[in-house]
């Protein structure tokens, strides 16, 4: 599972993470990969029939299933069943510096039951299903994780730019809904973008421990964990506990902030809008008239339209291995030591790559909150139309059918 690859320890292991250089290929994906795409998808990961493939997993049933599947398709397969002993010996494992940001259903379930799973040292937890709209409109909240509350994205942003609201408004909305800087806040959503948008906003505000439930409600239900339909209303609190924002540095709010940063530190502006939006064929939104991108924007991979970021998701709709994204970025001239501002139309999609850089411990990454929406509102800002140098769309190596 992602969390074990990322850095969490297996229950019988003394350390977590993955063997250096290991390719991630999760058994759960087998149910989602189209038969006619299997070989090309595996090849994009570096798995081909001319190599011997060694599979390892701490779950021996999963290991049996995936190795059998590959062998049946004609791959040269070997199985390593002793990963737990490997992890407990002195052999090195690799993990992401902030792997704890992305949690599994099993981790969250342990916290709900009063346990102290790895990296959890708190005794105050709130779980939120995140989507747009108040409770009456929140379809995704109809069935939810036991004890979860609804988080309306309007609590942190407003039109017409859909940037973060003022610190005062955000503070009022957070304390009205029981959120303080020192509670552990776990966010999940049907559409990852909403939860990661809010995670970024809560980090900006000053929540010290905010996590993302990777896989959302689908992953929770697949793990046979309980849901409920009753509406839970948070108890308001008197104070957030500190001044908002505590981390203004992760937000570049408007076009002039971007231009200032470009002059000061060579900031690269990374577009996470679909290829048709990036090249100016469409604006992507019925409420955004302008087409194009801020001048100099680099395409940073995206999704099929403004509602998804498919290049960043695995077949089972969990987040893709950040190491694969880094390889894609390198081809685009996007590197770890650069100053990088991710943006999209209004800031939801951009939160996904920002979250991944945060997991990896990258230091100089931001969300440019205003995005294309704010840029196209003022004709004084330079616009690029069409792909630079007529480049064709780069391959995301993620076509599973």
Residue ranges of each PLM-predicted region?
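Cytosolic catalytic domains that perform sulfur/thiol-centered chemistry
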Residues: 1-401
């Amino acid at each position: 599972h992602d969390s074990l690859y990322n850095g969490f320890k297996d229950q019988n292991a003394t350390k977590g993470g993955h063997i250096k250089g290991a390719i991630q290929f999760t058994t759960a994906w087998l149910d989602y990969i189209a038969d006619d795409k299997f070989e090309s998808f595996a090849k994009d990961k570096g798995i081909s029939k001319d190599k011997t493939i060694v599979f390892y997993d701490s779950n021996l049933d999963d290991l049996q299933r995936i190795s059998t599947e590959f062998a049946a398709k004609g791959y040269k397969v070997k199985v390593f069943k002793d990963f737990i002993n490997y992890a407990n010996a002195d052999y090195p494992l690799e993990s992401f510096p902030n792997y704890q940001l992305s949690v599994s259903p099993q981790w969250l379930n342990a916290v709900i039951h009063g346990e102290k799973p790895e990296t959890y040292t708190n005794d105050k937890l709130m779980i939120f299903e995140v989507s747009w709209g108040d409770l009456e409109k929140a379809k995704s909240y109809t069935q939810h994780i036991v004890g979860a509350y609804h988080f309306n994205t309007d609590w942190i942003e407003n039109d017409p730019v859909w940037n973060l609201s003022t610190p005062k408004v955000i503070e009022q909305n957070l304390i009205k809904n029981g959120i303080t800087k020192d509670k552990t806040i776990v966010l999940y959503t049907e559409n990852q973008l909403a939860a990661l948008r809010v995670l970024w906003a809560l980090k900006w505000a000053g929540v010290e421990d905010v996590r993302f439930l990777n896989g959302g409600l689908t992953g929770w239900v697949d793990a046979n964990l309980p849901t409920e339909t009753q509406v839970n209303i948070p108890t308001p609190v008197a104070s957030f506990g500190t001044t908002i924002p505590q981390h203004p540095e992760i937000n570049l709010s408007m076009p002039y902030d971007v231009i200032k940063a470009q002059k000061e530190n060579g900031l690269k502006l990374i577009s996470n809008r679909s290829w048709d939006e990036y090249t100016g064929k469409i604006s992507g939104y019925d409420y955004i008239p302008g087409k194009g991108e801020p001048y100099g924007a680099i395409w940073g991979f995206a999704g099929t339209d403004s509602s998804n970021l498919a290049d960043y998701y695995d077949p089972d709709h969990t987040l893709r291995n950040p190491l694969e994204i880094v390889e894609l970025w390198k081809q685009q001239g996007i590197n770890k030591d650069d100053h990088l501002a991710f943006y999209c139309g209004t800031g939801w999609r951009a939160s996904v790559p920002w979250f991944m850089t945060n997991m990896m411990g990258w230091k100089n990454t931001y969300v440019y909150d205003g995005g294309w929406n704010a840029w196209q509102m003022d004709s004084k800002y330079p616009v690029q139309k069409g792909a630079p140098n007529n480049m064709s769309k780069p391959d995301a190596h993620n076509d599973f059918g």
